[in-house]
Every structure is written in C-alpha cells, then in structure tokens.
C-alpha cells in the first residue's frame, strides 16, 4: 500500500473530498430559515465558514456536518443523524434561532456563541478577548454581508 495516500487524505482540504449536489442543501436552508424566521443568508454564511458546504465535515473537536454541530448540540436540537443534510440544517437553524432570541438579534453575539458556546458569550457579551472568536465573528459577518447584498447569487459558494 502506498504510504503517501493516507497522508495526502489527511492534509487535503476536507471540503474538496466530499462535494455533493448543493441544490438540496440550499433548498433546506431556505425552508428551515423561513420556518424558524431567521435569515437564510446568515445560515448560509455559517455553513460557508463552518464546513464550506461539506456535509461530511468533521472538526478536530468533533463537530459534524454542514453546520458543524457538536454531538450534544445536534441531539438537543433534533439532529440524531448529524451527517444527514436536512437534519443538520434543521437543527443548526433551530440553534441559530435560539441564539438570536438569547442575544436579542445581535449577530456578533450570535456568531460568537455559535463558535464558542452560548454560556461563555452570555457571560462576557462583547468583552470576549479570544482572537479566534473575534476572527470567526468577523469572517461570518463578512460572509453574511456578501450574501445579504448579493441575494441574486445562489446560497452556495459566495467566497470571493
């Protein structure tokens, strides 16, 4: 067996390994965003940043699927099969909606809580100093703005 192949697979960008037809995912984003009354551009921006639309993405910390849900969060919001595109988007969108309520629609806090967990962000509000959280919030915000002001584009692949 060639030893370089497993190494290549480990180092190859994960979003290149499992590209699928985006149409169902886009449809589910629109459907669940409308159902939970949250911006589809926000949900799509989170997917852009979290998994780059790879439904089989797994983070180093164990987050799974398009919206990179941690196992407990996935179960809490109804995704018992976190790699199932519809379940992942439904649960992730429901989680975003809960965060929107908790943080009174402040997208900065919603993005920070999505990334770092809602408990710490609820305590710190905008006083968080973790550079990873700050960078994540700025990246999600940028993707959201790109999508919001370019609504004619499909939900997938808005990366400039």
Residue ranges and their predicted role:
Residues 1-3:
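Positively charged n-region of N-terminal signal peptides that target proteins for export
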Residues 17-160:
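Catalytic glycan-binding domains that act on GlcNAc-containing polysaccharides
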Residues 5-6, 16:
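Cleavable N-terminal signal peptides
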């Amino acid at each position: 067996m060639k030893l370089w192949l497993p190494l290549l697979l480990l180092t190859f960008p994960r979003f290149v390994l499992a590209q699928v037809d985006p149409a169902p995912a886009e449809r589910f984003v629109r459907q669940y965003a409308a159902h939970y009354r949250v911006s589809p551009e926000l949900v799509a921006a989170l997917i852009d940043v979290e998994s780059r639309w790879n439904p089989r993405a797994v983070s180093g910390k164990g987050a799974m699927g398009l919206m990179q849900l941690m196992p407990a969060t996935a179960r809490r919001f109804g995704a018992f099969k976190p790699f199932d595109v519809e379940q992942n988007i439904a649960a992730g969108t429901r989680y975003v909606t809960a965060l929107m309520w908790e943080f009174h629609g402040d997208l900065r806090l919603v993005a920070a809580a999505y990334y770092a967990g809602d408990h710490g962000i609820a305590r710190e509000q905008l006083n968080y100093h973790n550079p990873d959280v700050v960078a994540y919030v700025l990246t999600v915000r940028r993707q959201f703005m790109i999508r919001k002001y370019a609504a004619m584009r499909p939900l997938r692949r808005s990366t400039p």
